[in-house]
Amino acid sequence: MAIHNLACVRDERQLFSGLNEEFAPGDGVQIEGSNGAGKTLLLRILAGLTPPDAGEIRWRQRPLRQCRSDYYRELVYIGHRAAIKPVLTPRENLTFYQGITGLRNDYAIYRALEQVGLLGYEDVRAAGLSAGQQQRIALARLWLTSASLWILDEPLTAIDHQGAQALVRLFEQHCATGGMVIMTTHQPLPASRYRMRKVALRMAEATSCFG
């Protein structure tokens, strides 16, 4: 995946411009920046949900506009909103998700719910759960997907330290098998050998480093 000269303007203010990055299989990338720097908007642009004001995204060397169907099959995007069905239970939400992906594995669903701390709530309607618990239902999808590209906005916010450790281990496993993780977080990652490359959005430009 590559982005070329990406720019974003909101309310007549340029959030970032001239953003050039390449993301290769095995990459874990953390987007950094102050509040209002455009981190969430950048993730939405990368997920194909918001058009950039300039620049291009390429997937497997093809412009995104030419391969959207292929791209979306390889993508999991989890934003601030949980994007779940509130009338369904956590178990039913994940069963529904597996149906979309063409898979069905009840054991995997219960294992995913265990990883995000929702065992015991699997048959409670999502509408009766807290916002954080609803977000954890969305995060549980990561244990069920075969998609190669994960774009995640503040995935650590809704989970405790143990859950964060499990999630970081999952990131490490995903990247070790050729997957990619692009995420934002205000929280430090749990101690791990796993290292993410950092892309910092500052003053309408971006810089890269390893952290």
UniProtKB/Swiss-Prot annotation:
It is found in: Cell inner membrane. One of its GO terms (biological process) is cytochrome complex assembly. Signal peptide: none annotated. ATP binds at G33, S34, N35, G36, A37, G38, K39, T40. Its EC number is 7.6.2.5. Residues 1-211 form the ABC transporter domain. It is a peripheral membrane protein. GO terms for molecular function: ABC-type heme transporter activity; ATP binding; ATP hydrolysis activity. SMART domains: AAA. Keywords: ATP-binding, Cell inner membrane, Cell membrane, Cytochrome c-type biogenesis, Membrane, Nucleotide-binding, Translocase, Transport. It comes from the Bacteria. The keyword Cell inner membrane applies. The keyword tRNA processing does not apply. InterPro entries: AAA+_ATPase, ABC_transporter-like_ATP-bd, ABC_transporter-like_CS, ABC_transptr_haem_export_CcmA, P-loop_NTPase. Disulfide bonds: none annotated. It catalyses: heme b(in) + ATP + H2O = heme b(out) + ADP + phosphate + H(+). GO terms for cellular component: plasma membrane. Its main location: membrane. The complex is composed of two ATP-binding proteins (CcmA) and two transmembrane proteins (CcmB). NCBIfam families: ccmA, PRK13538.1. Belongs to the ABC transporter superfamily. CcmA exporter (TC 3.A.1.107) family. Part of the ABC transporter complex CcmAB involved in the biogenesis of c-type cytochromes; once thought to export heme, this seems not to be the case, but its exact role is uncertain. Responsible for energy coupling to the transport system. This is Cytochrome c biogenesis ATP-binding export protein CcmA. It comes from Sodalis glossinidius (strain morsitans). The lineage of its organism: Bacteria, Pseudomonadati, Pseudomonadota, Gammaproteobacteria, Enterobacterales. The gene is ccmA.
